[in-house]
Amino acid sequence: MEQRITENMGRSLKEHGYLDPVFVGKGSFAKVYRVRDEKRDFQACKISKVTEQWEQECRNSREICHPLFPAYREHWTDGEWGYLVMEFWDGCDLRKMLDRRGRLSPGQAARIALQITEGLQYLHERPHPFLYRDLKPENIRIRVDGSCLLYTSPSPRDT
């Protein structure tokens, strides 16, 4: 899949009220675009081929409600493509921050670690716990105010 939006993808986004897609990144299975909703607020839209993994990510995203994880907005399919819309957070991923600045101060590291620990605790203490299996600097987004967000979707804990 190319970084630019195809005509069909642009049409599908527009039909659901999202405009001005701008490529912001990619993972193993999806590309992520920043889009504007009807209120002109930014949202993140993950576009990928519809697979069981994509369907599971949509279900998981709907269930998780914690400040460390992007808020679910909606999802839909259009042919072979799936669209998952979530809250968009401006900021920088921790990997880029470390590459630019070098190591974090002890205070910065402690604040980030505390937020991540609270989010992981939330996942593990749910009635149906989730595991976050992709914890790495590239998946930790840091805002200017120091708050964090974990990207990628947690998975239900194997029983």
Residue locations for each model-derived region?
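Short beta-strand micro-motifs within the conserved protein kinase catalytic domain, predominantly
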Residues: 71-82
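Single conserved hydrophobic/aromatic residue that forms the stacking wall/gate
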Residues: 151-159
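AlphaC helix of the protein kinase catalytic domain
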Residues: 94-104
